[in-house]
Amino acid sequence: MLYELGRLAPGSFDVFLDGVVVASLVRSGPHHGATWSAELLLDLDQKDRPPPFRRLEHQFATFEEACDWLGNPEIASEP
């Protein structure tokens, strides 16, 4: 799956799949020690979730870890 990130605000991204927003990626907490979460926007049955989503929400220690999990998506330039 090829994902793309669209920056909304510092620490907040839309996650696109085939041009459609399917999830959000957001930072929780201050920069130092912040965690990141990727959350599907629709409550899909597990069999219908796009890989690598096995749950509706996944937690990560760093932005880089989240990007690795998403297959190193391209970050779209800001409008």
Residue spans of the language-model regions?
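Mixed-charge, Lys/Arg-enriched low-complexity segments
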Residues: M1-G6, S37-P79
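Short N-terminal "domain-start" leader segments
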Residues: M1-L44
